[in-house]
Amino acid sequence: MRGFLLLSLGVFSFSALAADLPGSHDLDILPRFPRAEIVDFRQAPSEERIYPLGAISRISGRLRMEGEVRAEGELTALTYRLPPEHSSQEAFAAARTALLKADATPLFWCERRDCGSSSLLANAVFGNAKLYGPDEQQAYLLVRLAAPQENSLVAVYSITRGNRRAYLQAEELKADAPLAELLPSPATLLRLLKANGELTLSHVPAEPAGSWLELLVRTLRLDTGVRVELSGKHAQEWRDALRGQGVLNSRMELGQSEVEGLHLNWLR
């Protein structure tokens, strides 16, 4: 009986692995969604990617993005087909949560028509027509990984097609050259803070000034009812700087964590 059980488990494990494309594998940074299968996989030692930082469209035959990140480097791209009992939204939410728990800095997050054209994201950005579906059924996230992988970008895109098949695209680009300063939009920061309850901004400088300070001020001004706990080695300095920019002291508390960068916890 024990031998039969071991054989059955072995067959099950082999079947699960056999469903994946030969030679494919998950990204180290991103756990696989349960029962998802890799149906497309590609690695390239050097490839250029242009990732949107805003809605994507085509005007007069030209591709237009509200913002973009352009980088070249080692690319690993894979497409998961999701099990029919789970939605693409569930898989996307799981991926988003995993990346933020790894202290990745969010650069852009959109859903539905806010992303722009699904056809352009599928074909012009990711080069995979399998990812084309209704604009209302898509979601997209771009993050920058924390040190020592600060020159790596991870993009995640989910879609439920018209035939109800759901897919999740995940790819990591390890840039050949150091990435410049990359900032998320205030709307993306606020949306992620509310969705996850917390955020770690690992690329925030120790000295609160310049573009990061302006970004956090604009983020907190989008919803004046939001209160946050600030943690990190320089949280006190950031709180003082935000207060100096007009953010009410009553909206900010200090936490105990001594993490690198700045950690925000939503106080509800």
Swiss-Prot record:
It comes from the Bacteria. This is Uncharacterized protein PA1624. Keywords: Disulfide bond, Periplasm, Signal. Residues 185-268 are annotated as: Domain 2. GO terms for cellular component: periplasmic space. Monomer. It comes from Pseudomonas aeruginosa (strain ATCC 15692 / DSM 22644 / CIP 104116 / JCM 14847 / LMG 12228 / 1C / PRS 101 / PAO1). Residues 1-18 form the signal peptide. Disulfide bonds join 110-115. Was identified as a potential drug target. It is found in: Periplasm. The keyword Disulfide bond applies. InterPro entries: DUF4892. Folds into a unique two-domain structure. The structure consists of two domains, domains 1 and 2, which are connected via a long linker. The interior of the C-terminal domain is not optimally packed, leaving a cavity lined by hydrophobic residues unoccupied. This cavity may sequester a hydrophobic ligand. Residues 24-184 are annotated as: Domain 1. Its main location: periplasm.
